Amino acid sequence: MVAGAIEDTPREPDLTAARPGSSIRDTRGDRIFNAVNYVVLSIYLLIVLYPLVYIISASFSSPAAVTSGLVRLWPVDPTAIAYETIFKDPAIVRGFLNSIFYATVGTALNVTLTLLAAYPLSRKDLHGRGAIMVFFFFTTLFSGGLIPTYLVVRDLGLLNTRWALIVPAALSVWNVIITRTYFQSTIPDELHDAATIDGANDFRFLRDVVLPLSGPIIAVNALFYAVGHWNAYFDALIYLNDESLYPLQLVLRQILVQNQTNLKMTGDIQSMLARENLADLLKYALIVVATVPLLLVYPFVQKHFVKGALIGSLKG
């Protein structure tokens, strides 16, 4: 009787046979939804990827092919004449080195100041942190203006120096807010209490506990600041007169303007057409030269970027 009762007991359906690695069977609607997602995302990928492929292909094509519109996907009459023309100018190498300096030194200073500002503001026992945050946030609503900022930079003795592109943009309030929110969401008060009992002060706690746990938000800040420094153009145009201090973006602008000026001064029609074709080709090569360094850096911080950006901006 017992055996019969056990056999008559209804059994739960075996859902593990639905599909490997899942206990939930996809419905027809789920499959349609997934298919539509794949199609839409694939189309979006092609829309985003094609301009990049086209620019790279055009930069390696012949000037005549680019001007005639023969380049579609792959290089036509492959040549590296555009890159040879660019890197013959020593100003390009100097601009690269200057941009690397601005990006590395500036980013290191930016991240350091951001962490030192965000950590105290994340502590509930900081007296007056609400008023401090009001002052921080006020600067995001009202700026000092172009001319007053220029006068401040001049009076500080930073004009026409490398620090003119680093010190005025040493801190981003938005990044401070994101970092503060990250600390509040991921660093529990109990961890600070335990470190205090062990005799650690705030600086030691920040160095030995907070920083090792803050890899994602540090990567987010570093990427934001590095991209800003690498693309710096307007500040350099205002504060720098010495061409040896120009960042890459300003050097590339000079090359384009110089080619256009030389083109207008050319008297021979055939020479003018040749230089016009080369000028069009240089535009694509210059885009590649200015963009590739950032594309090479991003994959190394991508895994931290998504986590840090989401936690820092959504929680808290």
Regions found by a protein language model. Name each.
Residues 2-316:
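A hydrophobic, multi-pass inner-membrane permease signature
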